[in-house]
Design a protein with these regions (language model features):
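Cysteine-centered motifs
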Residues: 23-24
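C-terminal motif of bacterial Sec signal peptides marking the signal peptidase cleavage site
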Residues: 33-35
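Right-handed parallel beta-helix/beta-spiral solenoid domain characteristic of secreted/periplasmic
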Residues: 37-44, 58, 78-122, 144
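Extracellular beta-strand/beta-solenoid scaffold signature
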Residues: 46-47, 69, 93-103, 119-126, ...
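Glycine-rich repeat segments that build the extracellular carbohydrate-interaction surface of secreted
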Residues: 49-68, 79-84
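Right-handed parallel beta-helix
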Residues: 62, 84-87, 108-119, 131-144, ...
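Acidic, glycine- and Ser/Thr-rich low-complexity intrinsically disordered tracts
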Residues: 301-438
Length: 438
């Protein structure tokens, strides 16, 4: 019999495979469009997606560096913006023409992850009046390094509730790399901040857990404080633990127009001002040249040089001339324990009058932990520790209460007066931090 001829069969794909193939082609086309289109086309497309988004939408951004010249804004709840990685999807605002922020978010249930925001004219990522916010693996940076012309804030949530900022990076901010203000229920974890004026700022905020962060090579590592004349007062219940606040000795590059941050002494590890219920434990706080930890009331923090500059800008006028009767300027109920503190105060910043005067009185160096000793007159000065500052097991950290109210006439170096404990503060619980949280 003759050999049978090969069958001329045509391959067939199932409807499902055809759908998958079409989807892949569409995705590839979109990626090509994002990657190869003109910068203005990418910007227009992305802003259009943000304007037309619906709750539940995920806006995927491709790998690449994309140039934008105006603020991106979102006001729709329940949206996720997701890139391919903080060093792979880069939104560059170098040469920004319109708007101050890189991104301005006024929406609840918002997630942004795996994206970089670079070289904005003002703040990089601003989030306002929002609840249930997640910022994950986001890098904000001014790529020219420390410069007074950089934007003030990197990651900048204000008036938020249930906020998680994790695994993110901030570099080059002329005020704070990661700031949280007038907010409630906040977790800051595993972030890295460097070469900012202030690494972290926790301002007028209640219920915060800040842990496993690294703050290094900033002017100051972390500030925890309340300021007057802001809508929300009474920030408290702050836990700072398992962090590294080390080598924060970058010269202060904030412009005077930004107000108080201009006076932050170079070489400040952590400062705690005008706030209560703060627990600081299991941290490494080392080699900050002015002081490792500075605990002060508001009026000590605002030195004479600052007061002379109240007319410099509306910011300084508001902060340095407070008339807020709701405001409590005193610090109390602060518990520092089980920290590794050493090497602070070796080369204090003489640019700031108050630091210069204090260092001169102490022979040119400052202790690791510096406390002004100022308390509310109503607390009873006959008690040995009316402000309830408690210190315990902080390695061999040196200490001084420099008696600011008494003109430094009765300083106290003996830390034993402050060896006590306070009840541990409870953990901050927010839904999005539950996985892998502490």
């Amino acid at each position: 019999m003759p050999n049978p001829q090969p069958s001329a069969r045509v391959p067939r794909f199932s409807p499902l495979l055809r759908e998958v193939g079409s989807c892949c082609l569409l995705t590839a086309a979109l990626l090509l469009l994002f990657s190869c289109s003109k910068p203005e086309d990418f910007q227009k497309s992305l802003q259009g997606k943000l304007i037309n988004a619906k709750s539940g939408d995920v806006i995927d951004l491709p790998e690449g560096k994309f140039h934008l010249d105006r603020t991106l804004s979102l006001t729709v709840n329940g949206v996720t913006i997701r890139g391919k990685g903080m060093d792979k999807t880069i939104l560059s605002f170098a040469g920004q023409k319109t708007g101050a922020q890189g991104m301005l978010i006024k929406a609840n249930d918002f997630v942004i992850e795996d994206v970089a925001i670079e070289d904005t004219a003002g703040d990089a990522l601003t989030i306002q009046d929002a609840s249930n916010i997640t910022v994950r693996r986001v890098r904000v940076e001014w790529t020219r390094g420390p410069n007074s012309a950089n934007g003030p804030y990197g990651i900048y949530p204000v008036s938020c509730k249930n906020l998680l900022v994790e695994d993110s990076v901030a570099r080059g901010a002329a005020d704070a790399g990661i700031y949280v203000g007038q907010s409630e229920n906040v977790v800051l974890r595993r972030n890295h901040v460097e070469f900012n004026v202030d690494g972290f700022e926790i301002e007028n905020t209640e219920n915060v857990d800040a842990y496993e962060n690294v703050s290094t090579h900033n002017t100051g590592g972390m500030g925890v404080f309340n300021l007057p004349n802001l809508p929300r007062q009474g920030g408290r219940h702050i836990r700072v633990y398992n962090n590294q606040l080390v080598d924060n000795n970058t010269p202060n590059f904030a412009p005077k127009s930004l107000g108080p941050i201009y006076y932050l002494p170079t070489g400040t590890g952590m400062y705690i001002m005008a706030i209560r219920d703060v627990e600081v434990f299991n941290n490494k706080i080392q080699n900050n040249n002015t002081v490792n930890i500075y605990i002060i009331n508001y009026h000590t923090g605002v030195d004479e040089e600052s007061l002379r500059d109240t007319a410099a800008s509306p910011i300084t006028q508001q902060v340095f001339a407070p008339d807020d009767k709701r405001y409590d300027p005193f610090v109390r109920d602060v518990y520092l324990h089980d920290n590794d503190i050493s090497g602070g105060g070796q080369s204090p910043d003489n640019r700031v009058d108050g630091v210069k005067m204090l260092a001169a009185a102490l022979g040119g160096k400052l202790p690791d932990i510096l406390y002004d000793g100022v308390v509310d007159p109503g607390w009873g000065h006959k008690r040995p520790n009316p402000g309830q500052l408690c210190l315990s097991k902080n390695a061999a950290a040196s200490f001084l209460n420099f008696d600011a109210a008494g003109g430094m006439h009765h300083p106290v170096r003996d830390v034993k007066r402050y060896e006590c404990s306070l009840p541990a503060l409870s953990a901050v619980a927010i839904p999005q931090a539950a996985a892998g949280g502490k």
